[in-house]
Amino acid sequence: MKGIILAGGSGTRLYPITRGVSKQLLPVYDKPMIYYPLSVLMLAGIRDILVITAPEDNASFKRLLGDGSDFGISISYAVQPSPDGLAQAFIIGEEFIGNDNVCLVLGDNIFYGQSFTQTLKQAAAQTHGATVFAYQVKNPERFGVVEFNENFRAVSIEEKPQRPKSDWAVTGLYFYDNRAVEFAKQLKPSARGELEISDLNRMYLEDGSLSVQILGRGFAWLDTGTHESLHEAASFVQTVQNIQNLHIACLEEIAWRNGWLSDEKLEELARTMAKNQYGQYLLRLLKK
């Protein structure tokens, strides 16, 4: 399975902060925002990853992440010339995806929860259809919304409806079989001129191959698209890390625990950051 991180967009809701820098490069406590969605792909066992950025930000992402070898993965890059919809990622990434299945994660989404790694690996193991994740929110009109019947089976999906049929939002994490590329090519722009991911999900729903997994108690899904939510996300990460004495979305640790980095490579990377808490945390891992 291949992985795609969509890190484009103009971040207008975060102006003036994002006038000079990509939203996905902003810090969320002690790491760049993009570390969090990248960690999701790595926890799912995905090592071949495409990062799609706005044209003006591509070089900055390359400078931060490189070719991925420091994290035991392979990272390539592409650009989205203009923010024409999430589903456009599959058209941009068609050659990268090839004949593989694909997982798309949005560059400004943060996930945390018990047994999340197991949940991800189960979704990645599916060879047919699509898997998306639903989470209860206070403001469903801001998101794609999934409606369930009395048996809690998905019956409809709408993108940012004025009158939501439920308070279950579809999160920014999607697993698809290889048909996603051809399905995306069939989409027509919505009223707001975008290729909507909800329309793609609806195609899977209509042919009976969409699985909607619930992220319930014990899970946190954080959308960092506003000043308030960005601050809340940083506070959440700080609190969890301080209480549990672990780091969320520590890419080097994930790679090391997955067997993708040797002890020697982890120590080498940690030494370059030994003067801060992040590097010291990596060094402590080697002593346990």
UniProtKB/Swiss-Prot annotation:
InterPro entries in the record: G1P_thy_trans_s, NTP_transferase_dom, Nucleotide-diphossugar_trans
SUPFAM superfamilies for the chain: Nucleotide-diphospho-sugar transferases (SSF53448)
Cofactor(s) the protein requires to work: Mg(2+)
EC number: 2.7.7.24
Phosphoprotein keyword on record: no
Residues reported in the UniProt entry to bind Mg(2+): D108, D223
Subunit structure: Homotetramer.
Record's protein name: Glucose-1-phosphate thymidylyltransferase
Origin species: Neisseria meningitidis serogroup A / serotype 4A (strain DSM 15465 / Z2491)
